[in-house]
Swiss-Prot record:
Top-tier EC class: transferase
UniProt KW GTP-binding keyword: no
Record-stated family: Belongs to the DNA polymerase type-B family.
Catalysed reactions, as listed in the record: DNA(n) + a 2'-deoxyribonucleoside 5'-triphosphate = DNA(n+1) + diphosphate
Stated role: Replicates viral genomic DNA in the late phase of lytic infection, producing long concatemeric DNA. The replication complex is composed of six viral proteins: the DNA polymerase, processivity factor, primase, primase-associated factor, helicase, and ssDNA-binding protein.
Any one GO MF annotation of this record: DNA-directed DNA polymerase activity
Superkingdom assignment: Viruses
Gene3D superfamilies recorded: DNA polymerase family B, C-terminal domain, DNA Polymerase, chain B, domain 1, Helix hairpin bin, Palm domain of DNA polymerase, Ribonuclease H-like superfamily/Ribonuclease H
Subunit-level organization: Forms a complex with the ssDNA-binding protein BALF2, the DNA polymerase processivity factor BMRF1, and the alkaline exonuclease BGLF5. Interacts with the putative helicase-primase complex composed of BBLF4, BSLF1 and BBLF2/3 proteins; these interactions may coordinate leading and lagging strand DNA synthesis at the replication fork.
Protein name: DNA polymerase catalytic subunit
UniProt EC number: 2.7.7.7
Annotated Gene Ontology cellular component terms: host cell nucleus
Localization annotation: Host nucleus
Length: 1015
């Protein structure tokens, strides 16, 4: 609205408006509300609860004790509020998206059914299942009683384990505050660590409080020398694995007792049940309509880039775009929360607030009362979430967790990594909010795309063909202070960003991918993106071992010794003007684990050779010489590897899913199936890494070293085999004698590079068509001759020409005409456009022009010194022409100033820099001297290099740095030689493989053959 009916009760108080509550609120109100254009805030304290203006009406944001605030009341008015539950126990079908672990103490007995009270005396674990009811889509919280936390211990002879456990609890300060129920029973289990372990007696120690597990386990290990097993398994995983449940999917409860009072959650419906009441419906992969929210914030930076702990750096607007997963992409509800009045925005619900505090309460309650399950945004983990939570906690003393989906014991936090200060956008920050699946689309795009930068505008253009209207943060204060119309423009920009992010979520369908990984890995969805791959494989291994009565020991220091990682066949650097065939091992590391039956349970370590008794070398077991000695692994017919069994079952399942996918016509079901097979692929590829991470959940570096040893051996065997093949051998691979035209009898195969799981084969003397003809047959023949299933070599791609620089760095043109670059930056991203474009021209010429390619091949096969004695091949002169023309363009002023600009971020105040001898700081100081507008912190300062005064040679960069606008306005000549040297250095880095793979040698050749015309 335009502001006619909006008033700020905290600047013009109306004492009779509301009943005074007990609480006093701090509000920071922009001065521009009183004086248009004014900066700063007014500090106001008072008892009025948070308020909101919407469609000419004033409403209280919060609600009663049941949490029914403005958003809930709005739903009730629209008729979309959900019905209450029945008042008696009845069957319940519901879908689960999150699983929480909570603890009840005996004080809760009065509010739970009498038959459940025994589970929580003196305390007990209550698993909360959050999801949606099948009947009507209402949000539900199901409290599940009866789950236990436990671990196993192998005790020395004569130790009274129960007494030792009780002693540990007595010594715990935590247990004195919260008494814990304990039970100890003898069970028969087998340790997964090492082949030949017989079933034996172990003590299963069950505790009613999960926080006691770690203390008791450590006590038994350190004080009594017990070997501990599975003390790092939480109650949530026990709940899922012990009962063969799912972390995302449909459940049925045969007797769900509604909780009508004293609820734990703000879900629309809440129930109590026992573990035994539940069952899962795995066959149903459908989804209910979950609510997804994309949000974005706009902030006020009083002194440059906004800082959350500065009182005046307010959050001005929060855009919220809502989408139901059951709807088509694009059918969004758009909401804008804004400080002050705002003109109407078409298609957007605009809610106006008198202060930031009121708006923050509304935002948190929107997530809660509109039953949001998935929250996304762009770089929200690094900026938006920390900013909102810091403002809430440090400025207003709001506890965001208290406004979440759980009334008590919830979590709402941002965990910044230790290196978070190294750079904006560079750190992987974790967001943990109870009952929400946080998905940062910035991190998703970084993982799935390869772009020059990952700004939202760049990504939106690339994926969606959408142009993002940008507002620089310097414009935000002016627009906001301009009044309702300025806030409308700012709001349009803010809502647009959230809508684009929701489009990206739907483009990648990342929420489905997360759910499928969660299901296969037995972990909650919220742990998929942030907790890495270790937990996925650990949970799967735990499940497989549990079915066979095996248990997993806790890792010890001896498990963490180092080993030699994967190596490569050193590249023969140079330019190859003949076809280069690349063959890959399909799923190399998983296939090695399967082929050689590698596992914790099949391994016999040095010193344990007595376990080999009765086994035949080569037939019953294989031996590998590793860093720590000779290790043996028994073969599948003796004992099947758990890791190999997991991989085999996953890959079989993936194959079946891909078969279903090929026949499926329903778009939604196709998406789910596709994400299922991708989830399996991702988890399979994580198995090797799981064993090789020294500080992981269950490391076994001897397995990881065996895998890499076999990988190296396979590469070397394949190299020798391929290089021994003659044209006649290749001709014999034809499907029939007349299927192929005769191959060139002078042709020769040579492996020029081997990279972990692939070989680069130079097909010298063979044409492109000949190479493509025998590529698949060559890979299949090598596989049959050298390897056992499931190891398989496949022809992946063929280059028509290739610049091989160093390991993991090459540029080539594929046979379909596309250029492929790996590990190569043409020039540094910080280079100016002039250098970038000219270097690209050089590369394109070398890869595309037939005469230049021939000359490049000649140069790369002779010592670089011959270029000085014999000169450059004639075919290479067009490259020199490009460089000479660039110099002429510079000297004659034909290069636009914009192409010569560099830029560096002003990361902190000038006084905070240890040294100011940097070009961008030199320009900053010139701004000060000229009394010009100064850049703010986080601004990028542009600069060019100009000729030093008096033409002094060897001047420092800081003396040559100048503001581009000033240089252009005053006709200051640019430093021609400096820019040309930058160009030659960039070109030399690209062309180094032509000159003994030495960038210094390449630079000296280019300097020698480029002509710098006299002034």
């Amino acid at each position: 609205m335009s502001g006619g009916l909006f008033y700020n009760p905290f600047l013009r108080p109306n004492k009779g408006l509301l009943k005074k509550p007990d609480k006093e609120y701090l509000r920071l109100i922009p001065k521009c509300f009183q004086t248009p254009g004014a900066a700063g805030v007014v500090d106001v304290r008072g008892p009025q609860p948070p308020l909101c203006f919407y469609q000419d009406s004033l409403t209280v944001v919060g609600g009663d004790e049941d949490g029914k605030g403005m958003w809930w009341r709005q739903r009730a008015q629209e008729g979309t509020a959900r019905p209450e539950a029945d008042t008696h126990g009845s069957p319940l079908d519901f879908h689960v998206y999150d699983i929480l672990e909570t603890v009840y103490t005996h004080e809760k007995c009065a509010v739970i059914p009498s038959d459940k009270q025994g589970y929580v005396v003196p305390c007990g674990i209550v698993i909360k299942l959050l999801g949606r009811r099948k009947a009507d889509g209402a949000s539900v919280c199901v409290n599940v009683f009866g789950q236990q936390a436990y671990f196993y211990a192998s005790a020395p002879q004569g130790l009274d384990v129960e007494f030792a456990v009780l002693s540990a609890l007595k010594a715990s300060t935590f247990d004195r505050r919260t008494p814990c129920r304990v039970s100890v029973e003898k069970v028969t289990r087998r340790s997964i660590m090492g082949y030949g372990n017989h079933a034996g007696d172990y003590h299963k120690i069950t505790l009613s409080h999960p926080n006691s597990v770690c203390h008791v386990a450590t006590w038994l290990q350190d004080k009594h020398g017990c070997r501990i097993f599975e003390a790092n398994v939480d109650a949530t995983r026990r709940f899922v694995l012990d009962n063969d449940f799912v972390t995302f999917g449909w459940y049925s409860c045969r007797r769900a007792i509604p909780r009508l009072q004293h609820r734990d959650s703000y879900a629309e419906l809440e129930y109590d049940c026992e573990v035994g009441d539940l069952s899962v419906r795995r066959e149903d992969s459908s989804w209910p309509s979950y609510q997804a929210l994309a949000f974005d914030i706009e902030c006020l930076g009083e002194e440059g880039f906004p800082t959350a702990t500065n009182e005046a750096d307010l959050i001005l607007q929060i855009s919220c775009v809502l989408w139901s997963t059951g709807e088509e992409a694009g059918r969004y509800r758009r909401i804008l929360l804004t400080l002050g009045t705002c003109e109407d925005i078409e298609g957007v619900e605009v809610y106006e607030f008198p202060s930031e505090l009121d708006m923050l309460y509304a935002f948190f309650q929107l997530i809660r009362d509109l039953s949001v399950e998935i929250v996304t945004g762009y770089n929200v983990a690094n900026f938006d979430w920390p900013y909102i939570l810091d403002r809430a906690r440090h400025i207003y003393s709001i506890n965001p967790a208290s406004l979440g989906k759980i009334r008590a014991g919830g979590v709402c936090e941002v965990r910044r990594p230790h290196d978070a200060g190294k750079g904006f956008l560079r750190a992987n920050t974790k967001v943990r909010i109870t009952g929400l699946i946080p998905i940062d689309m910035y991190a998703v795009c970084r993982d799935k795309l390869s772009l020059s930068d990952y700004k939202l505008d760049t990504v939106a253009r690339h994926l969606l063909g959408a142009k993002k209207e940008d507002v620089h943060y310097k414009e935000i204060p002016r627009l906001f202070a301009a009044g309702p119309e300025g806030r409308r423009r700012l709001g349009m920009y803010c809502v647009q960003d959230s809508a684009l992010v929701m489009d990206l979520l739907n483009h990648f369908v990342i929420h489905v991918e997360v759910a499928e990984i969660a299901k296969i890995a037995h972990i909650p969805c919220r742990r998929v993106l942030d907790d890495g791959q270790q937990i996925r494989v650990f949970s799967c291994l735990l499940a497989a071992a549990q079915k066979e009565n095996f248990i997993l020991p806790m890792p010890s220091a001896s498990d963490r010794d180092g080993y030699q990682g994967a190596t490569v066949i050193q590249p023969l650097s140079g330019f190859y003007n003949s076809p280069v065939l690349v063959v890959d091992f399909a799923s190399l590391y998983p296939s090695i684990i399967q082929a050689h039956n590698l596992c914790y349970s099949t391994m016999i370590t040095p010193g344990e050779e007595h376990r080999l008794a009765g086994l035949r070398p080569g037939e019953d077991y294989e031996s590998f010489r590793l860093t720590g000695g000779v290790y043996h692994f028994v073969k599948k017919h003796v004992h099947e590897s758990f890791l190999a069994s997991l991989l085999t079952s996953w890959l079989a399942k993936r194959k079946a899913i891909k078969k279903l996918l090929a026949a499926c016509e329903d778009p939604r079901q196709r998406t789910i199936l596709d994400k299922q097979q991708l989830a399996i692929k991702c988890t399979c590829n994580a198995v090797y890494g799981f064993t090789g991470v020294a500080n992981g959940l269950f490391p076994c570096l001897s397995i990881a070293e065996t895998v890499t040893l076999q990988g190296r051996t396979m590469l070397e065997r394949a190299k020798a085999f391929v290089e021994a093949l003659s044209p006649a051998n290749l001709q014999a691979l034809a499907p029939s004698p007349d299927a192929w035209a005769p191959l060139n009898p002078e042709g020769q195969l040579r492996v020029i590079y081997g990279d972990t799981d692939s070989l680069f084969i130079e097909c010298r003397g063979f044409s492109e068509s000949e190479t493509l003809r025998f590529a698949d047959a060559l890979a299949a023949h090598t596989t049959r001759s050298l390897f056992v299933a499931p190891i398989s070599l496949e022809a992946e791609k063929t280059f028509s020409c290739l610049m091989l620089i160093t390991k993991k760095r090459y540029v080539g043109v594929l046979t379909d005409g596309k250029t492929l670059m790996k590990g190569v930056e043409l020039v540094r991203k910080t280079a100016c456009k002039f250098v970038q474009t000219r270097c690209r021209r050089v590369l394109d010429l070398v890869l595309a022009d037939a005469r230049v390619k021939e000359a490049a091949s000649l140069l790369s096969h002779r010592p670089f010194q011959e270029s000085f004695t014999q000169g450059l091949p004639v075919g290479f002169l067009p490259v020199i022409d490009i460089l000479n023309q660039a110099y002429t363009d510079l000297r004659e002023g034909r290069v636009p100033m914009g192409e010569l600009c560099f830029s560096t971020e002003l990361s902190r105040k000038l006084s905070a820099y240890k040294s100011t001898q940097m070009p961008h700081l030199a320009v900053y100081q010139k701004f000060v001297e000229r009394n010009e507008e100064l850049p703010q912190i986080h601004d990028r300062i542009q600069y060019v290099f100009v000729e030093p005064k008096g033409g002094v040679k060897g001047a420092r960069k800081t003396e040559m740095a100048e503001d581009p606008a000033y240089a252009e306005r005053h006709g200051v000549p640019v430093a021609v030689d400096h820019y040309f040297d930058k160009l030659l250095q960039g070109a030399a880095n690209i062309l180094q493989c032509l000159f003994d793979n030495n960038s210094g040698a390449a630079l000296s050749v280019l300097q020698n053959f480029t002509a710098r015309p006299p002034f």
